[in-house]
Amino acid sequence: MAAESGELIGACEFMKDRLYFATLRNRPKSTVNTHYFSIDEELVYENFYADFGPLNLAMVYRYCCKLNKKLKSYSLSRKKIVHYTCFDQRKRANAAFLIGAYAVIYLKKTPEEAYRALLSGSNPPYLPFRDASFGNCTYNLTILDCLQGIRKGLQHGFFDFETFDVDEYEHYERVENGDFNWIVPGKFLAFSGPHPKSKIENGYPLHAPEAYFPYFKKHNVTAVVRLNKKIYEAKRFTDAGFEHYDLFFIDGSTPSDNIVRRFLNICENTEGAIAVHCKAGLGRTGTLIACYVMKHYRFTHAEIIAWIRICRPGSIIGPQQHFLEEKQASLWVQGDIFRSKLKNRPSSEGSINKILSGLDDMSIGGNLSKTQNMERFGEDNLEDDDVEMKNGITQGDKLRALKSQRQPRTSPSCAFRSDDTKGHPRAVSQPFRLSSSLQGSAVTLKTSKMALSPSATAKRINRTSLSSGATVRSFSINSRLASSLGNLNAATDDPENKKTSSSSKAGFTASPFTNLLNGSSQPTTRNYPELNNNQYNRSSNSNGGNLNSPPGPHSAKTEEHTTILRPSYTGLSSSSARFLSRSIPSLQSEYVHY
């Protein structure tokens, strides 16, 4: 009893006599008065190089589900609940981030209050997070930065755990399923660059432009911005009704002022969502999306880096971090001017596009054609060759290859829904779960084609199974993946290939993928006491053939006169059967007006 009291004396208190966070050397046993739990081996970050966090949005969601369930449990109602972690600096930082995020989302604490609680007690300082580059860390992202990013995302409606679909998030973030994430729901989708033909190359699944069409059309993606050199014909997107723009700059580098202006102009004049890609969809992609969010939502550089990495781990790398820090003041000024002119302009005089055309003092360029060819700017001859590594591949190539080595995640039992037969909002092509007998046979398919074992230079941290007691069916080979492969992985220029892609509920034909996968003004000094890191209503129909069912009637939430500044929700829904508190702070439905 004395030992137990001693542990709590040094613990961080989040709810008096109820919720604590502690760093312990040994694994404690729960007692009559205290319940201990840890997520150190359950929610594990998948690193690229020396990066180790923050944990992604799906893991934040799973943690909140877990903690809400414990706090609502009748058997634990009279006990103190202690989330404990070990002295491993990386695991400890991620554990602290999770309980801090919970405090911000559910306990209505400010990021500063939550961070202050983490610093209380006898806890040592926390290791800051870093980027996913190969070299030394030159930019520290603190836990406080991450909590502030969560708070900003919550305020602006970038996520809502009442409607978040964790299975969908984890499905589409995987390389074989498209490798994309929403950064601003209904506005920005970050994805890995398409290739001329869907195939597996050196163990890495590549997707043709056509593979993305059903999902893009279903979720109102109207424009595609390419930041890497041309490897597929833009005509393939434009012929399908999408606008396509080329804004090339070198892999791992920072964009010129001209590129930033043109990107902002495109985004401010585009109705609908914009899909942005470079090679891996991490560095260049995250940097330009960050510029827009800093301008229109007044995120600080640290807040937006944190938010984008929580949505899409590994984003914004090396000098790109410092670039955003330098650009923060000017982007804020541009945003203030933009909002001032938008506010003073009578709404009856025309649309936002007409207003934008008069903002000459903001140095926004003129209208761009649907297909913006870099030859006009003399930049088409630029290539990523300047930054190739000794083995002939670029930073983006390496990051994509590392990501492709990740093992499929087995979902924890608490994440499964009672309405598994319903289609996901991001993909209605998953009307059922495969039976255990089908799973058994699927495992034996041609998995040898995929390079799943980590390289000697960069070992991957594989996720461990999160199920603690219940037998959980494999998420990686459910029917959603089966059906979506017909769209995401079998689309090529070859007519025969197109014929073989199936949208049937009961099965799908064997493409290379189906065979494989059935198995402020002045930047503030950030001196914290640390050491040296979707609008989608769930579809109730169960037609599992494709990804392009019509969007739901949710868009009424968006304010019509500021559509480019408000995210809408077209896809992160979940069932009411989840273990979630229904007392989410009201700030989730409030927007901040600057």
Curated annotation (Swiss-Prot):
One of its GO terms (biological process) is cell division. Residues 163-176 are annotated as: Linker. It is linked to Deafness, autosomal recessive, 32, with or without immotile sperm: A form of non-syndromic sensorineural hearing loss. Sensorineural deafness results from damage to the neural receptors of the inner ear, the nerve pathways to the brain, or the area of the brain that receives sound information. DFNB32 is characterized by prelingual, progressive, moderate to profound sensorineural deafness. Some affected men are infertile. Interacts with KIF20A, which is required to localize CDC14 to the midzone of the mitotic spindle. Keywords: Cell cycle, Cell division, Cell projection, Cytoplasm, Cytoskeleton, Deafness, Disease variant, Hearing, Hydrolase, Non-syndromic deafness, Nucleus, Phosphoprotein, Protein phosphatase. Changing R284A: Loss of phosphatase activity. Belongs to the protein-tyrosine phosphatase family. Non-receptor class CDC14 subfamily. Residues 177-343 are annotated as: B. This is Dual specificity protein phosphatase CDC14A. Dual-specificity phosphatase. Required for centrosome separation and productive cytokinesis during cell division. Dephosphorylates SIRT2 around early anaphase. May dephosphorylate the APC subunit FZR1/CDH1, thereby promoting APC-FZR1 dependent degradation of mitotic cyclins and subsequent exit from mitosis. Required for normal hearing. Pfam families: DSPn, Tc-R-P. Its EC number is 3.1.3.16, 3.1.3.48. GO terms for molecular function: protein serine/threonine phosphatase activity; protein tyrosine phosphatase activity. One of its GO terms (cellular component) is kinociliary basal body. Residues 179-336 form the Tyrosine-protein phosphatase domain. The keyword Lipoprotein does not apply. It is found in: Nucleus; Cytoplasm, Cytoskeleton, Microtubule organizing center, Centrosome; Cytoplasm, Cytoskeleton, Spindle pole; Cytoplasm, Cytoskeleton, Spindle. Residues 396-435, 487-560 are annotated as: Disordered. It is an enzyme of class 3 (hydrolase). The modification Phosphoserine is found at S484, S583. It comes from the Eukaryota.
